[in-house]
């Protein structure tokens, strides 16, 4: 890697062999971005905090796993201790946390991670309102792709203490944080998936093609804005 180049580390939190195109989607967005950054993907089982020293930004991916399982599955929690350590101790390198990554960030700062009593949100698109635009999100009303069972309440005192809550939603009866950023550090955490699935994923009879296309465009812009933020932050 070029020492002067902006470098992004993508941590893949999906179990090996799990069928998903989300990591490939993130990689494609990074490769095609005019921000022209270099990147490396590392599976969470191989991640060590010392790896981030040469990087300008870190992306924590989603997963089919649930952080709420940490409360009774110590073995699972142990697999992510390195990422929890990174989130707690990193003061310099910007972090973009997506869905499961969002929950890792919240958990690292002492928030309660709750699980829906139903089967969760299986890849639907919802519209959310953002209180104010910022470095990543430039519109106040956007469609986003959600696919999760865990959620974080906007009333959580540790979230309110450490994060600026920029978007919440009431989805299938649950109040949840959709977007937050750390009050002092460059940590951006999204409950939703900006790495929206490829065009073939959304069934045309269930989701309007125009909304699906806008969701992909908005998500891609969010990731690209993070890349630009990392580039400027490096300078």
Model-derived regions, located:
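Short amphipathic alpha-helix
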Residues: 22-30
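Post-Walker A helix-loop "phosphate-sensing" segment adjacent to the P-loop in P-loop NTPases
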Residues: 111-114
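Amide-donor transfer/coupling interface in amidating biosynthetic enzymes
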Residues: 3-20, 32-33, 49-50, 54, ...
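Flexible gly/pro-rich beta->alpha loop and the following alpha-helix that scaffold active-site loops
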Residues: 31-96
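Hydrophobic/aromatic ligand-binding patch that stacks against planar heteroaromatic rings
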Residues: 86, 104-105, 179
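Glycine-rich nucleotide phosphate-binding loop and flanking beta-alpha elements
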Residues: 65-67, 102, 153, 198
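Gly/Ala-rich beta-loop-alpha elbow adjacent to hydrolase catalytic centers
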Residues: 97, 101, 106
